A protein has these predicted regions:
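Helix N-cap / beta->alpha transition motif
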Residues: 1-2, 57
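Short Cys/His-centered divalent metal-binding micro-motifs
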Residues: 2-30, 37-40, 48
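Short C-terminal domain-edge/linker segments immediately following a structured domain
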Residues: 31-36, 252-254
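Short, Lys/Arg-enriched charge-dense amphipathic segments
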Residues: 35-45, 59, 178-185
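Short flanking/linker segments adjacent to small metal-binding domains or redox-active Cys/His motifs
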Residues: 40-76
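C-terminal, charged low-complexity interaction regions
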Residues: 73-260
Length: 260
């Protein structure tokens, strides 16, 4: 893959997947660092039942997102300290063109007695675009097939269809709307069921097998999770690559990789 294509696939395909809450939470649990060396925080910001935004540190210490709301003649301030409350209230009052001496009078009344501490119940609203997850699986399956079978796979009719869809992604045409890739789906029920019984999530598994219908199928299982377990049709001419019933597979231990 050329530098431009690789960069565009990262922007328009990988980015949605790796930054999704489900994937970030897996990476956070396994302490897998991103390219910038940071461990992702999937729970960085949520909301309370009454809609207040709450930030969560990497150590799961909550703090409010500073804000000022006007309710009638009152200004209600959310802050984490006296200094922070005075600062944001002063900014708000200046924007309301209040005289400086009045601003000083009001903010001087803010002290520790004005604060209420609470243990928030934090909600996270998570939206999953399944088609974009399937697009990620399609890319991984295609790249794995090229890695295993070389240039001869590039001429396969199904490979050409997959490549055409990935080229749409590279061009940015799938940025706002992504249809379901016909070659990709979630993994079959028997595989999903077995994943649900496994407590081991620190690995990726990918395989290619031929079926009795002469189809070349990839199973892409990321973090051993049903949310990221996929099946990709790579070819309708499996006999060109594998004998019936033959399988090629790789197992990537992420915990071992991180410790090296």
């Amino acid at each position: 893959v050329c530098k431009h294509c690789n960069s565009s696939l990262g922007t328009y395909v990988d980015n949605y997947f790796v930054n999704h809450h489900f994937i970030k939470s897996k990476r956070q649990f396994l302490r897998l660092r991103s390219q910038n060396g940071n461990i992702p925080n999937a729970f960085q910001e949520g909301i309370t039942a009454d809609g207040e935004r709450i930030r969560m540190s990497a150590d799961f210490v909550p703090s409010v997102v500073p804000s000022v709301k006007q309710e009638g003649n009152k200004l209600i301030t959310h802050a984490n300290s006296v200094a922070e409350a005075r600062k944001i209230l002063s900014t708000k009052l200046r924007r309301l063109h209040m005289p400086l001496e009045k601003i000083e009078e009001y903010i001087s009344k803010i002290d520790e007695s004005c604060f209420q501490s609470f243990q928030p119940e934090i909600r996270y609203d998570i939206l999953l675009d399944i088609n974009r997850f399937l697009l990620e699986a399609l890319k991984i399956g295609y790249e794995y097939a090229v890695y295993k079978f070389g240039d001869r796979y590039l001429d396969d009719p199904t490979a050409a269809n997959i490549r055409a869809r990935l080229n749409l992604a590279i061009s940015g045409k799938l940025q706002f709307s992504c249809e379901k890739p016909p070659e990709a789906s979630y993994a079959p029920e028997y595989l999903i069921s077995s994943l649900g019984k496994s407590s081991f999530i620190g690995a990726h598994y990918i395989s290619i097998a031929s079926t009795i219908h002469n189809e070349l199928i990839a199973h892409v299982v990321l973090f051993f999770s049903p949310v990221s377990a996929f099946q990709v049709l790579l070819s309708k001419q499996a006999n060109l690559y594998l004998e019936n019933g033959q399988i090629t597979e790789d197992f990537i231990d992420l915990t071992q990789k991180e410790s090296q």
